[in-house]
């Protein structure tokens, strides 16, 4: 799994801090994963 990036950028694979394989967006503070209506936020 890809790690959350240090700079804002979309993740091509799920972040290792997220349980879902949904779309993941990396932010400096962590990452946000979405799968349908489910959303999970997580920090590095």
Swiss-Prot record:
It is found in: Secreted. Its main location: secreted. It comes from the Eukaryota. Signal peptide: none annotated. The keyword Signal does not apply. GO terms for molecular function: toxin activity. Disulfide bonds join 4-18, 11-24, 15-42, 17-33, 26-31. Expressed by the venom gland. Keywords: Disulfide bond, Knottin, Neurotoxin, Secreted, Toxin. Pfam families: D_CNTX (PF17492). Neurotoxin. Causes spastic paralysis and death in mice within 10 minutes at dose levels of 3 ug per mouse. The presence of a 'disulfide through disulfide knot' structurally defines this protein as a knottin. This is U4-ctenitoxin-Pk1a. It comes from Phoneutria keyserlingi (Brazilian wandering spider).
């Amino acid at each position: 799994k890809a790690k959350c990036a240090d700079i804002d950028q979309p993740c091509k694979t799920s972040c290792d801090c997220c349980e879902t394989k949904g779309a993941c967006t990396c932010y400096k503070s962590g990452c946000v994963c979405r799968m349908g209506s489910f959303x999970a936020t997580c920090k590095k």
